[in-house]
Amino acid sequence: MAYMCTDSGNLMAIAQQLIKQKQQQQSQHQQQEEQEQEPNPWPNPSFGFTLPGSGFSDPFQVTNDPGFHFPHLEHHQNAAVASEEFDSDEWMESLINGGDASQTNPDFPIYGHDPFVSFPSRLSAPSYLNRVNKDDSASQQLPPPPASTAIWSPSPPSPQHPPPPPPQPDFDLNQPIFKAIHDYARKPETKPDTLIRIKESVSESGDPIQRVGYYFAEALSHKETESPSSSSSSSLEDFILSYKTLNDACPYSKFAHLTANQAILEATNQSNNIHIVDFGIFQGIQWSALLQALATRSSGKPTRIRISGIPAPSLGDSPGPSLIATGNRLRDFAAILDLNFEFYPVLTPIQLLNGSSFRVDPDEVLVVNFMLELYKLLDETATTVGTALRLARSLNPRIVTLGEYEVSLNRVEFANRVKNSLRFYSAVFESLEPNLDRDSKERLRVERVLFGRRIMDLVRSDDDNNKPGTRFGLMEEKEQWRVLMEKAGFEPVKPSNYAVSQAKLLLWNYNYSTLYSLVESEPGFISLAWNNVPLLTVSSWR
């Protein structure tokens, strides 16, 4: 249920755009016929260039009236006649008060999901997914960046906007609050009064350092007393609205989906039958944008697109209803695009999956996607992750896309885990500053409902009852993922210049802070960073 808003809003936004485009084309055609009947004394000018138009509509854009109902649609060929308006307020209320099949699932949790998962944005940026850098015209419109560029950040904003604060130096544990938290994490039994002093110095409505310190102090306090987290009382409405606020304010999920989808498009550019195996699917938000791009690619529409969805661990023990709802939404959207689409939910536990669990036809080009989910299988032994990667390798994929958070929390002792997470979350909390006021209720909700719970979980992961092989969900840095991918038999695929340029355009067009930057690193990683702290990394493998 929590992800229905994510998926349906985006799908409907794209569908509505396509419908409006069709209506505009029909209107233009009708006007042209009328002009032919009445002589025009003024000849039409002839331009030697083409204007960018509806061919590159935005897979992330959401209008003021989203919803996932296709009124008057008895068949996808009649999509252009759907003219009923969609009311965003009524739609949001229906999400909170109603729901899809996943809401009735008692195993579907409110918490435990990714803090950067995609949510519809009111901002708008053009989609360049359907323009693979193969032809000369595309390269003229968007020149590739210099190969030597390793770190890039958007140009300074226009003068009417206040300049952002200057970049800060590398993470400094000498910040009094952070140093006190780290010292307490090292030897809590010898510093019983430290936690009290920390609580007196932090605030959930202060500056980013005080706000991060507040949630770590709360987590350490709950760990010591073994009391339940107060954030667990947040409502489903808070959860939904928090994701929306985050995605409006920050580019995390947009960057991850855009970069991975571009790699998939380039790897399957001439393929007619495409099969995507998605490890850890929620509501399929990533695939709405890809379907749109495939429907308009220069080499023509694929003959068939199939997605095999392996449920995300956070969907609980009964993910079937949620997967069925996801498949139905994607099928309806594919019909709007006139695409031959199939969706297969894979309900076998991941530990029991093998090659026979998937229907793979000989003429298919297969793609495997791990998007912000593989770390949830990661424990200190990496056994389950290794099993999943070897399974993916056995399917002989054309490309494997991997997106992960950029912080080492797994194979480190508790004090270093706290130190690394302080660096990570201080950057995340700071990244909310440009677009969310400190006294904003929306910001407080995002930090409490999304990040506060994550901090609580990573602190509690060091409990004595966590036996080896039972502690999951702690993130790793890209170098460890490189080791795991290469151990499973994969080799890296360097992102194309076009993919990098496209990620830069995302930051440009959304007018994000200049403290966001892209960092390219060997052998083929591209990371989104805030103030020189990488937060999210996407890579491709084969």
From Swiss-Prot:
It is found in: Nucleus. Its main location: nucleus. GO terms for molecular function: DNA-binding transcription factor activity; transcription cis-regulatory region binding. Signal peptide: none annotated. Residues 366-457 are annotated as: PFYRE. A motif (LXXLL motif) lies at residues 374-378. Residues 154-169 have a biased composition (Pro residues). This is Scarecrow-like protein 7. It comes from Arabidopsis thaliana.
